[in-house]
C-alpha cells in the first residue's frame, strides 16, 4: 500500500466521489470503501464527464455522467461580476468553462477542487471551521468564508449543525441548501450524519432566514425543486 504523500498522485473513490490527494489509503477516509474501488484521477476523467443542466438563466447544475457514486450536485452561479461554483464536482473535466470562485457549503464534497483551482486559477474558499477537519488537510483554500456575507448578489449564511462550518447560500430567488436536509420517500429528514440536536437547531435558523425571502427554487444535493413544495415538507420537519 502506498501511503507516502505525493502531490502528483490523486485517487477518486467511486462509491462516494471523495478525492484523495497525494496518498493511497487502504480505505476511503470519507465513506470507508476499500481501495479496490478507487480510480486514479486520470482514469476517472476518462470514464466520467461533468454535465451541466440549466436551473435558470443564472444557475447551472453540475453532475458527473455517468453518476459517480454518492457525489452531490455542484452549482455554477453566474453573477454580473464573477462566476462561482457552490461545491465542486468530483470528476476533473477540463472541458468545463472556467470559474472564478469555488465556495463550499461544507467539507464533505470538496471534489476535484484542487485541480480546478490550478486549471482555472480559481479562488477556493470554505468556512474555517470545516477547513481544519482531517479530510480537508490535503486541499488548498485561498481564504476563509466569513460567517455571513453578501458578495456579488450571493448571500451566505453560516448555520453550523450538520458540520461546524456549514454554510448555505441564496442567489436572487434560488436557495442552495446542499444536503442539510434529505427528501426520502416524499418526506423530508435532516441529514443523519452529524450532531442531531445541532442539526435541528440549524434548521430553525434556516427557517428564520428564508421566511421573508422571495425564493422560487431550491437546489439540493441531488434534486432541484420548486420552493412551495419544498417549504411544505420543511415546515413539517421543523414543527
Where are these regions (language model features)?
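Short, flexible loop segments at the rims of nucleotide/cofactor-binding pockets, characterized by
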Residues: 61-66, 82-88, 101-104, 153-159, ...
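Active-site HxH/HxHxD metal-binding segment of metal-dependent hydrolases
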Residues: 89-152, 236
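Active-site- or DNA-interface-adjacent structural scaffold in DNA-acting proteins
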Residues: 24-29, 137
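Short, solvent-exposed secondary-structure boundary motifs
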Residues: 58-70, 130-131, 146, 158-160
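Short Cys/His-rich micro-motifs in 6-15 aa windows
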Residues: 31-44
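Active-site-proximal loop/helix segment associated with metal-binding centers of metalloenzymes
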Residues: 65-72, 128-130, 134-139, 184-194
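Metallo-beta-lactamase
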Residues: 5-26, 34-37, 83-84, 132, ...
Amino acid at each position: 500500500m502506498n501511503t507516502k504523500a505525493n502531490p502528483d498522485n490523486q485517487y477518486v473513490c467511486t462509491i462516494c466521489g471523495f478525492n484523495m490527494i497525494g496518498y493511497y489509503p487502504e480505505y476511503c477516509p470519507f465513506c470507508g470503501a476499500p481501495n479496490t474501488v478507487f480510480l486514479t484521477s486520470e482514469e476517472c476523467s476518462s470514464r466520467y464527464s461533468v454535465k451541466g443542466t440549466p436551473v435558470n438563466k443564472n444557475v447551472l447544475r453540475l453532475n458527473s455522467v455517468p453518476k459517480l457514486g454518492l457525489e452531490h450536485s455542484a452549482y455554477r452561479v453566474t453573477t454580473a461580476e464573477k462566476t462561482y461554483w457552490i461545491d465542486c464536482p468530483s470528476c476533473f473535466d477540463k472541458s468545463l468553462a472556467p470559474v472564478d470562485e469555488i465556495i463550499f457549503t461544507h467539507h464533505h464534497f470538496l471534489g476535484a477542487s484542487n485541480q480546478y483551482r490550478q486549471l482555472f486559477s480559481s479562488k477556493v474558499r470554505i468556512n474555517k471551521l470545516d477547513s481544519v477537519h482531517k479530510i480537508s488537510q490535503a486541499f488548498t483554500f485561498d481564504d476563509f468564508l466569513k460567517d455571513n456575507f453578501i458578495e456579488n448578489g450571493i448571500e451566505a449564511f453560516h448555520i453550523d449543525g450538520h458540520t461546524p462550518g456549514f454554510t448555505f447560500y441564496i442567489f436572487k430567488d434560488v436557495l442552495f441548501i446542499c444536503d442539510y436536509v434529505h427528501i426520502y420517500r416524499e418526506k423530508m429528514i435532516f441529514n443523519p450524519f452529524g450532531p442531531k440536536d445541532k442539526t435541528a437547531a440549524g434548521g430553525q435558523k434556516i427557517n428564520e432566514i428564508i421566511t421573508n425571502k422571495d425564493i422560487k427554487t431550491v437546489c439540493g444535493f441531488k434534486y432541484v425543486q420548486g420552493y412551495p413544495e419544498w417549504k411544505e415538507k420543511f415546515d413539517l420537519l421543523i414543527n
